[in-house]
């Protein structure tokens, strides 16, 4: 039975199934690799947004990471409690979030681990193949949800 759980799926399998399985396995590898830093894959994604932006509101973070505001609020509170994020009011209605010094150090350490996991996932691919995979995934991520084939026969 355990052999069936670890067997690779057929490349001809349903694309949605392959995406889901790949995502689950990759996320599990991230969670495992980040665990001793006190981060989950989701928390790493949140912190990584700050690599290119100094501070954001929770609503902006939620939009960027495609989660609900409520989910982001809970995540930000957890990261704040862990000493990785801090909040400061912009005005009476908006509170900005930014990484603490500890948060930036944790992000740097986590990013090294994530890159190692990525290298493992991409092992065996040529540079051209890796670039093709990354380009394809980026294009797929940008695909609108309204894209449908209307001439199905």
What is the role of each PLM region?
Residues 58-59, 70, 77, 95:
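Residues within helix-turn-helix
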Residues 64:
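Residues within the alpha-helical elements of helix-turn-helix
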Residues 53-57:
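Short capping segments at the starts of secondary-structure elements
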Residues 27, 77-138, 142:
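Charged, amphipathic alpha-helical coiled-coil/dimerization segments
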Residues 1-37, 128, 151-153:
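N-terminal leader segment of winged-helix/HTH proteins
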């Amino acid at each position: 039975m355990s052999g069936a759980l670890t067997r690779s799926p057929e490349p001809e399998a349903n694309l949605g199934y392959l995406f889901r399985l790949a995502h689950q396995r990759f996320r599990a590898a991230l969670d495992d690799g980040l665990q001793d830093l006190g981060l989950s894959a989701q928390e790493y994604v949140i912190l990584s947004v700050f690599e290119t932006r100094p501070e954001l509101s929770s609503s902006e973070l939620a939009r960027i990471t495609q989660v609900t505001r409520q989910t982001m609020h809970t995540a930000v509170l957890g990261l704040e409690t862990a000493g990785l994020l801090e909040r400061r009011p912009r005005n009476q209605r908006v509170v900005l979030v930014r990484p603490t010094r500890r948060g930036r150090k944790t992000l740097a350490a986590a990013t090294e681990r994530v890159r190692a996991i990525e290298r493992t996932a991409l092992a065996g691919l040529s540079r051209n193949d890796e670039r093709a995979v990354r380009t394809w995934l980026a294009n797929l991520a940008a695909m609108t949800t309204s894209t449908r084939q209307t001439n199905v026969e």
